[in-house]
Amino acid sequence: MDKKSARIRRAARARHMMRENGVTRLVIHRTPRHIYAQVIAPNGSEVLAAASTVEKAISEQVKYTGNKDAAAVVGKLVAERALAKGIKDVAFDRSGFKYHGRVQSLADAAREAGLQF
């Protein structure tokens, strides 16, 4: 099993548990250059709020889009958008990535902005 398939397997196991519990989830995806965050409805069919470093407003705020500072900006923005729609409790779906670095920075910023997970 290679590194990518192991990550996908971890992510599938976590998502299965979240679907069974029927909770709204904050899903992240990480690439070397960008980070994406989405708040997804419990049934998984609807994206309720989203933010990423691809957005022009965020990429203009930060010097480089693939670091912890950019992840913190994305975390704060996705939390603000979710709170504006009345969502404050979510489950954090890290998509099999380690809770370290950019993933941790995004999660901490979302918590500071008011999301509960």
Swiss-Prot record:
Keywords for this protein: Ribonucleoprotein, Ribosomal protein, RNA-binding, rRNA-binding
Picking any one GO molecular function of the record gives:
5S rRNA binding
Matching Pfam families: Ribosomal_L18p
Domain of life, per UniProt, equals Bacteria
Q: Which GO terms describe its biological process?
A: translation
State a GO cellular component annotated for this protein. cytosolic large ribosomal subunit
PANTHER family per the record?
39S RIBOSOMAL PROTEIN L18, MITOCHONDRIAL, LARGE RIBOSOMAL SUBUNIT PROTEIN UL18M
Q: Subunit details for this protein?
A: Part of the 50S ribosomal subunit; part of the 5S rRNA/L5/L18/L25 subcomplex. Contacts the 5S and 23S rRNAs.
| Task performed by this protein | This is one of the proteins that bind and probably mediate the attachment of the 5S RNA into the large ribosomal subunit, where it forms part of the central protuberance.
UniProt family annotation: Belongs to the universal ribosomal protein uL18 family.
* Name listed for the protein in its UniProt record: Large ribosomal subunit protein uL18
Organism of this sequence? Mannheimia succiniciproducens (strain KCTC 0769BP / MBEL55E)
